[in-house]
Amino acid sequence: MKKWDYQNVRGTQDYLPEDESVRVWLRRELEEVFQQYGCKPMETPMINYTDLLASKYGGGAEIKKEMYTLTDRGKRALALRYDLTIPFAKVMAMNPDIRKPFKRYEIGKVFRDGPIKAGRFREFTQCDVDVAGVDSPLAEAELLEMATEVFRRIGLNMTIQYNNRKLLTGMLDICGVSKDQHSAVILILDKREKIGDKQVVNELKEMGVDGKAISKIAQWLKQMSQSGIVDFATDRPTTPIMAEGIAELQELEEALRYLNIDSQCTFNPFLARGLEIYTGTVYELFLTEGAIQSSVGSGGRYDQAISGLTGEEQPMPTVGISFGIDVIYTALKMEGRINQKPLLDYYVIPLQKQKEALAVASSLRKQGFRVDVEFKNKKLTKALDRANKEKIPFVILIGEEEVASGRYKLKNMETGAEQHVPFSF
């Protein structure tokens, strides 16, 4: 029989027990924080109609390039979800009677056929929180406070960068960029920290932006790098949409100060969050130390998505945030922050007394302990070696003598201390 050359699809990976146990812990920590903030659990399908995910209320042109598409037996065009946002918007559109404000969280696999780098894969797990029905920037402030609590609990230091798409839109209007070029220009600006100002200008030229507009953008890039929100409010010309963005940013900034998290938050006038779905506040989360340079979380306000799917003129105010389990796990591993805990509390080793060993294991499991039984009749030295390697704290030995006396032997693997525990065999 031919031996297959097994390997994972590029951009995917297996998580063996020692790794997956940490990821389970991460998910539980995030889920606990989400519930503390009043969020309710939800699950949506991984497979969706391509038209839904590719709609203008989805991720935009850049994400469409990365979608995994397929057809079913009925020749319907389908795609694997690339995030959890549009599936949430679909749920809200299909269930208009959901009481609002509505907070939900979802943890699930998503798929993007994009670049692969440290912590970035093509199949990955996202943890999303979204709030529908609140138009106040206080909703954003609460989500950002929740983010600081998430990273405090898992032991990583991070900072939050934030901006407002209305501010960017207004600046592009002032610079003279045509409306039909706004989305593409914002995508280029979103790459500024990676490619630098010179390359931003080069890409703007390549896409055919007016020369005068490019000159104004270049001047803006040079002048605004160290600007705060107050500079835009007092020292710069504004448009009505820009004034809205400034007011929302000022209200957000005030809330961040009141919540005492402003020291972890930085205004970045060039942060764009390239996805076309966003209509107001946008933010990204970055670790302050370590090798992971890309964001470990992001989000923003997308008031047009739900109403766009329902066809209603009245927007449904919605804001969300997303955390990447895989990139966070990678960061913990790279920084040596993973404190591997044992997966078992007890390891029962029968000395020719398998049925009795099962009875002891069953009793302990009913008390809430994690227990495994050795069934392969390993030599005692090999069984104890397994316990040491897996850092199992207690081993139970059951042989003829233990069954006859009605007491099993309990060994503390850290101290070596032994004791006999009564049990009715």
UniProtKB/Swiss-Prot annotation:
UniProt-listed SUPFAM superfamilies: Class II aaRS ABD-related, Class II aaRS and biotin synthetases
Classification via CDD domains: HisRS-like_core, HisRS_anticodon
Isomerase as UniProt keyword: no
InterPro entries associated with the record: aa-tRNA-synth_II (IPR006195), aa-tRNA-synth_II/BPL/LPL (IPR045864), Anticodon-bd (IPR004154), Anticodon-bd_dom_sf (IPR036621), His-tRNA-ligase (IPR015807), HisRS-like_core (IPR041715), HisRS/HisZ (IPR004516), HisRS_anticodon (IPR033656)
Keywords: Aminoacyl-tRNA synthetase, ATP-binding, Cytoplasm, Ligase, Nucleotide-binding, Protein biosynthesis
Substrates-to-products reaction catalysed: tRNA(His) + L-histidine + ATP = L-histidyl-tRNA(His) + AMP + diphosphate + H(+)
EC number(s) reported in the record: 6.1.1.21
GO MF annotations in UniProt: ATP binding; catalytic activity, acting on a protein; histidine-tRNA ligase activity; transferase activity
GO CC list: cytoplasm
Classification via Pfam families: HGTP_anticodon, tRNA-synt_His
Compartments reported by the entry: Cytoplasm
Protein's GO biological process: histidyl-tRNA aminoacylation
PROSITE patterns (UniProt xref): AA_TRNA_LIGASE_II
Subunit structure, interactors included: Homodimer.
Entry similarity comment: Belongs to the class-II aminoacyl-tRNA synthetase family.
NCBIfam families per UniProt: hisS, PRK12420.1
Protein name: Histidine--tRNA ligase 2
Organism: Shouchella clausii (strain KSM-K16)
GN (gene name): hisS2
